[in-house]
């Protein structure tokens, strides 16, 4: 009898385990693709083009989630250090280096390669073109060219030891032209022709900055001119390409000298113009040259340090002399800087907005006092809206007079989200657990709703969804009707420690346009090869960043850029859903939650206490490191 009971118990346990396994299997999500990379995964980078680039012990691997095998594998240089892999901003290119940072870089062989991660092709490899030393390697956009300098083992014995510059077309992968920086075999004292900055590629010629001065060549490599303006770091040309500005950082690194050069190489100013600090913004206007430079005393690096501040200068384009008798006081870092028809509008990180005419006169009746950290400055039909971590208001863009009767003030908030509700003609601002509604015409303020999120989170997303108001953070989602009444509040417990304020979403939209545009400020200037990225746009112009990126990529005329453009023309996967990492019954996992209902549409259990993953919020793909050498992908759009 006991034996029979034991057998029945055994059968029951087996049946129970099978049922449990079946339920588990139904909840578990099978990956769409499994990639065994055959080497330890060290790092994963989600690119702006939507391709995941994985650094392994063997090299780099590109993953395109729609394909079952890796898009590319680059093991030519072996394992790469993080500093040996450069993702060129706003492009499909990766520059890979080996030996560049070695103390023997000038003696031992150095290598460079350029990978098009969209096509999965190596489009330049220094070894294939017999480059023994690569000194510099720059991708130039929007021309879509590659400029390299170094020693190429081609030609006679003198040519093989003479520094050379070559320009390659990245679309055709062919050499456009090349030239030597000095005459091969020339007898005399050896001179240092090392390149000191980024070459400037113009329509008819190229200018190369060297330790001996600027060297200009035609697009066939023919000599045009040289001058003695040495150690220029970066250059900008005006629209006509007849006037060039060169920027030279002083030897102590604390100041910048600005030079103006004509198209024939002559110096157009009697003397260079020295500005304190490093130039962070440079604008050529019809009225003159606007320059923002950031001073740093080398001590406290905080933006709130009292001795660290920006200076604004306005120079006569013809002479380089100051137009303003007295520069405006900033008392902090210039965080926003816009050229308007009547003058220059700027906002300070530590608080404050002002506007100065091109001849140096104040346009605002008095400098506008604001809270710290100006998150938003934008045009509205009523005037200039500003939103900081502490307050918000709309002011007259001509005079600085406030449009709202008084600023909306709130306690310094860890996160502030805002949007415009066109149906109700009102601005909505979420700060410090409150949603404020501000009538666009009258400026009257009301507290629409309370938004107490779990884990002390603050909403960092605020959207209008079919007439309702959606708020989101890392672990919380809430929907309000247009009267502020709660329709749902869903909370998903974070897998880590709770009880601290979290500002940024746990699942970051790393493929967002913001990433591309943020990197546009290169070489100290808040501009990119595509033009100035710091524009005072209309507030809440939905989709403008995506359209800007799509148009920018489409303008290149290359197949890879076309694919990147198509990506940003498509609807983002996060438009109607949010992806959240949380604790599930079967372990840590990712949930896809619908914004309009708060319902979980998909669960993926990762079965890992500290999962390593990336989410493409735009494309709707989860990349998960299943073990040290295996990667899973899940399509979150299904």
For the regions a language model picked out, list residue spans one by one.
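Bacterial N-terminal signal peptides that target proteins for export
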Residues: 2-12
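A general, composition-driven signal for non-globular sequence regions
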Residues: 3-4, 18-20, 221, 597
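Bacterial N-terminal signal peptides
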Residues: 11-21
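Secretory-pathway ectodomains
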Residues: 25-638
């Amino acid at each position: 009898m006991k034996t029979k009971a034991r057998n029945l118990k055994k059968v029951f346990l087996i049946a129970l385990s099978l049922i449990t396994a079946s339920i588990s299997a139904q909840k578990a999500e099978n990956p769409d693709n499994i990639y065994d990379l055959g080497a330890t995964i060290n790092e994963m980078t989600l690119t702006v083009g939507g391709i995941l680039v994985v650094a392994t012990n063997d090299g780099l691997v590109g993953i395109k989630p729609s394909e079952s095998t890796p898009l590319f594998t680059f093991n030519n240089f072996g394992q790469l250090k993080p500093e040996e892999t450069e993702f060129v901003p706003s492009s499909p290119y990766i520059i890979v280096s080996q030996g560049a940072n070695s103390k023997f870089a000038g003696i031992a062989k150095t290598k460079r390669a350029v990978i098009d991660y969209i096509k999965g092709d190596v489009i330049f490899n220094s070894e294939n073109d017999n480059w023994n030393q690569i000194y510099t390697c720059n991708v130039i956009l929007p021309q879509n060219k590659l400029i390299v300098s170094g020693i190429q083992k081609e030609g006679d014995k003198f040519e093989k030891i003479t520094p050379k510059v070559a320009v390659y077309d990245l679309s055709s992968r062919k050499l456009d032209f090349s030239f030597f920086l000095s005459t091969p075999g020339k007898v005399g004292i050896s001179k240092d022709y090392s390149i000191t900055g980024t070459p400037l590629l113009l329509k008819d010629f190229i200018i190369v900055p060297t330790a001996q001065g600027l060297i200009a060549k035609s697009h066939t490599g023919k000599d045009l001119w040289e001058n003695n303006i040495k150690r220029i770091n970066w250059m900008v040309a005006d629209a006509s390409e007849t006037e060039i500005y060169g920027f030279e950082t002083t030897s102590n690194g604390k100041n910048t000298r600005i030079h103006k050069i004509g198209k024939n190489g002559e110096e157009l100013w009697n003397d260079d113009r020295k500005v304190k600090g490093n130039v962070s913004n440079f604008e050529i206007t019809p009225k003159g040259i606007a320059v923002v430079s950031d001073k740093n005393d080398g001590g406290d690096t905080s933006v709130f340090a009292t001795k660290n501040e920006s200076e604004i200068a306005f120079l006569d384009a013809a002479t380089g002399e100051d137009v303003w008798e007295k520069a405006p006081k900033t008392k902090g870092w210039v965080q926003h800087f816009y050229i308007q028809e009547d003058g220059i509008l700027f906002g300070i990180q530590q608080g404050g907005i002002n506007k100065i005419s091109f001849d140096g006169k104040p346009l605002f009746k008095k400098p506008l006092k604001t809270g710290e950290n100006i998150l938003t400055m934008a045009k509205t039909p009523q005037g200039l809206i500003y939103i900081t971590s502490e307050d918000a208001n709309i002011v007259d863009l001509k005079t600085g007079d406030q449009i709202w009767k008084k600023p909306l003030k709130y306690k310094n908030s860890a996160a502030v989200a805002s949007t415009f509700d066109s149906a109700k003609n009102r601005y909505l601002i979420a700060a410090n657990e409150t949603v404020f509604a501000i009538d666009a015409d009258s400026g009257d303020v009301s507290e629409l709703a309370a938004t107490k999120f779990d884990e002390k989170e603050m909403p960092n997303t605020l959207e209008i969804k079919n007439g309702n108001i959606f708020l989101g953070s890392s672990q919380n989602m809430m929907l309000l009707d247009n009267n502020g009444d709660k329709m749902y509040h869903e909370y998903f417990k974070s897998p880590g420690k709770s009880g601290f304020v979290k500002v940024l979403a746990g699942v970051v939209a790393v493929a967002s346009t913001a990433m591309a545009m943020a990197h546009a400020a290169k070489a100290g200037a808040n501009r990119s090869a595509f033009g100035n990225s710091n524009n005072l746009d209309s507030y809440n112009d939905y989709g403008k960043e995506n359209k800007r990126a799509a148009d920018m990529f489409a303008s290149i005329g290359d197949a890879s850029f076309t694919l990147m453009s198509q990506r940003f023309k498509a609807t983002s996967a996060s438009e109607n859903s949010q992806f959240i990492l949380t604790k599930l019954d079967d372990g840590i996992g990712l949930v896809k939650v619908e914004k309009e209902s708060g319902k979980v549409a998909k669960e993926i259990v990762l079965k890992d206490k500290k999962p390593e993953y990336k989410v493409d919020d735009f494309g709707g793909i989860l990349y998960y490191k299943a073990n040290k050498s295996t990667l899973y992908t899940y399509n979150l759009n299904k």
